[in-house]
Every structure is written in C-alpha cells, then in structure tokens.
Amino acid sequence: ATIVHMHVRDENGHLTNDITQFKRTISLIKDKCDILIEGSTGGVSELSVEERGFVISLPEVEISAINMGSVNLGEAAFVNEPEDIRIWAKMMQDYNVVPVVQCFEPGMLETVRVLKEEGVLKLPIIYGIPMGFVGSQPSCSVNMQYMVNLMPDNAVWYFQQHGMRDL
C-alpha cells in the first residue's frame, strides 16, 4: 500500500486543525492518487489533545500516527503524555482507524506492549520507526535491527527517514 503521512498547515505555514483545510488537502491528494491517508496526532505545536486528535474522526483517514512518547525534535520538545496517548488510541478504536505507533526510541516499543496488555491498543497495529531527527535516534543498521528485534514476531512495520543526513 502507498501511504501519505500528512500534517496540514495554514496559509502562514502553521500547523492547523481547520477541517476545511484538511478536507481540501485530502481531496487534492485523492484526485491524483489511490493512496491511504495517514492522519497524525503529532506535530510540534501548541494544539490541545482534542485539537491534535480531531483528524482521527475524518472518514477519509484510515490509519493514523500516534506517537508512543515524548521526544526532542531539533530545538523543540514533542510532548506526548501517556494519558493523551490513551485518549487518541481510544478514539482510533471508536472510529475504526488503524494506529501507526510511532516509536522514536526503544522505550516507546515498551509503551506499545503495555498499552496492548491494557487493551488500549488493539490489533491491527502498524509500527513506524522514525530515525534521523536531530535529538532522536540516528539512522543506522544497528539501531534499526535493535528496534526490529524488540517488536513482536510478524509485526508490520515501516522505516521513516528524516532528511538525508544519515543515509
């Protein structure tokens, strides 16, 4: 499957939760491509938990990224508190959206395990492994292999490279 992971920005370049902007962007993409739309609860921003999660309710969103913890991205702290993660996971269940659990570092894979045990995360789950962000895990085969080794057998996962720095 081909997936587009999207964050929508307003005319000033700021992250937005404007439903009109999202629907317009999704329409422009779908007009040109047969592609899965991956929403996201992410984005370094001042949006509230509800504002960050609204994309999950859009019928065009079939899968959505959900970050499994907090991480520094460059000079910004990307805060994802455990209770917020639970709220978004429950929304995904309610709207039948498949979670893409974004694990920036090994401890976040443990969070996935715990949330599965609690019943907060249910299968199917897709694992996203973002690497190469300044302030996060560098991209290299050793780090990738370690992350894959920590995943459950038969896990569905993908790698996400930020920039060209580590390639």
Segments and roles (model prediction):
Residues G43-E46, S70-N72:
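A short acidic, glycine/proline-enriched capping/turn motif at secondary-structure boundaries
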